[in-house]
Amino acid sequence: MKTISLRFLMTLGLMTLFVVSPFAQKDTGKIRIIMFGAHPDDCDERSGGTAALFARMVYAVKFVSVTNGDAGHQSMKGKELAKRRYAETQESAKRLGISYDVLDNHDGLLMPTLEVRLEIIKKIREWNADVVLAPRPNDYHPDHRYTGVLVQDAAYMVAVPDIEPEVPALRKNPVFLYYEDHFQRPNPFRPDVVVDITPVYDKKIACLDAHVSQMYEWLPWIGGYYEEVPKGKEERIQWLTARTSRPINAQTMASLEKWYGKERASKVKEVECFEVCEYGAQPSDTEIKRLFPMLGQ
């Protein structure tokens, strides 16, 4: 394995002091979940509702942004933007009751290097994760794709003692899952696990609302709908709620009925979906219910 320089290790140590969320959670002995996103709002968008449900059960949940988001704005940039977006992650963490870390990799320039892979391995080990969520490695944004690749590359290595030996290897392999996306090639997303987030949908909207630079500025600007964004706080929440809501398609409904039963599934309004990754532990339905105890409740 390539030798890592002392300078790199010192830099990584200093960086970690800056990016670790102050909203750390105690180890309760319950399921531990870590969710990776490329940018400091991605986890919120893909799994904010599921995180809220886990947090409500006092499970240990951590979001990790693999980049610092320093390119995601039409007028701000660099350190100023990264600082603002970090503050937004901490507000989101406070609203959800979770931990939120941000790695100091540049937005838009992420590559699946050994150094970043080791960062991912360390995060998973340090959290002693039972469940790991990440994007699929087929996506329009290179940072999303490479975040998926990096987590895939870590899936086996988290249990190998000689890799990153200063952090003890896991004695179990976590279950790795992908967030939902709409991309069809090389293969479409498969909703193996569908979580009813209707009871906590307001929590998801609240955590998204914390990312003001993204929800009300950058994404509307780059998406061509900036003029639609309301000015008032309450109007913005209503607008964001409407924009975030998605219809439940037939494939998702079939999986929802599997986990909740037809009667309950028919009443569900909002969901988040996940696909089991072929890497990592391969869970049975019984194990999925243990890891996602909100299923069927």
Task: Name each model feature, range by range.
Residues 1-5:
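N-terminal secretory signal peptides that target proteins for export/translocation
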Residues 7-19:
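Bacterial N-terminal signal peptides
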Residues 23-127, 149, 157:
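Active-site rim/loop-helix segments in enzyme catalytic domains that contact anionic ligands
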Residues 29, 162-165, 170-172, 187, ...:
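C-terminal accessory domains and tails appended to enzymatic cores
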Residues 49, 138, 182, 280:
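Flexible, active-site-proximal loop/turn residues at the rims of small-molecule/cofactor binding pockets
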Residues 62, 99-181, 189-190:
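Internal alpha/beta domain cores that form substrate/cofactor-binding pockets in large enzymes
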Residues 73-76, 187-191:
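Short acidic, glycine/proline-rich loop/turn micro-motifs
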